[in-house]
From Swiss-Prot:
Official protein name in the record: Ribosomal RNA small subunit methyltransferase G
Gene that encodes the chain: rsmG
Superkingdom classification of source: Bacteria
Family from the record: Belongs to the methyltransferase superfamily. RNA methyltransferase RsmG family.
One cellular-component annotation, GO: cytosol
HAMAP family in the cross-refs: 16SrRNA_methyltr_G (MF_00074)
InterPro entries: rRNA_ssu_MeTfrase_G (IPR003682), SAM-dependent_MTases_sf (IPR029063)
């Protein structure tokens, strides 16, 4: 996979150029919210340890740009997502809201719930929902397996668990015809094999991602229920 060259300049310039590289339109208001989100994450991180990444430049690339890279693939992969219809989305093991907060900023018609078992992380997401004016963003301080089935169009995770564990814990929150989507680094062949052997969910496709300024392999794993499993 070819890497996108590093982007010079300050955060605002780098963000604008990253959106251009991703062919992802972002108006001035959205860009301002994205930058405020990362700034607040840096501030909270000093006290609450939201993420192991401390460097502002690395946060911009490894958190913000990485999350932005899935917006267009989700729109292409979910017919309702690009039509303007409401989309119900769970972000499982969201931490400080990645990618959920970014998705809520970029798509106001996506109703995003960030689910995490660590209270300080969901408190941060709630703070961002208010501070950034995101009525389509909520946070749930709980384990995903403790929630009642949510009938989501899509449930997404980023560095949450193996594919089999993700499907086992979160699959019941996907409505009939919906999908599970896992953000991964290298294609996890062993995880895919374990998932397929389990039988309830199957990998529909593997979609490569190119994250601006990140020289690393990234992909999306799209999963659907196997026929006969509801």
């Amino acid at each position: 996979m070819s890497a996108v060259p590093d982007i010079p300049g300050g955060p605002a310039q780098r963000l604008a150029q990253a959106c251009d590289a991703l062919r992802l339109p972002a108006d001035a208001g959205q860009q301002q919210k994205l930058l405020r989100y990362i700034e607040q994450m840096q501030r909270w991180n000093r006290t609450y340890n939201l993420t192991a990444i401390r460097d502002p430049g690395q946060m911009l690339v490894q958190h913000l740009f990485d999350s932005l890279s899935v917006v267009a693939p989700l729109e292409r992969g979910l017919p309702a997502a690009g039509s303007g219809a409401r989309v119900k989305l769970f972000d499982v093991g969201s931490g400080g809201g990645l990618p959920g907060v970014v998705l809520a900023i970029m798509r106001a018609h996506w109703d995003v719930t960030c689910v995490d078992a660590v209270e300080k992380k969901t408190a941060f997401v709630r703070q961002m929902a208010g501070a950034l004016g995101l009525p389509n963003l909520q946070a749930a301080h709980t384990r995903i397996e403790q929630l009642e089935p949510a009938q989501c169009d899509v449930v997404i995770s980023r560095a949450f668990a193996s594919l089999q564990d993700f499907a086992k814990l979160a699959g019941r929150h996907v409505r009939e015809g919906g999908t599970l989507v896992a953000m991964k680094g290298k294609v996890p062949d062993d995880e895919i094999q374990a998932l397929q052997q389990h039988g309830h969910w199957t990998v529909e496709r593997i979609e490569p991602l190119v994250v601006p300024a990140l020289d690393a392999q990234r992909c999306l794993i799209w999963m659907r229920r196997s026929q006969g499993n509801i």
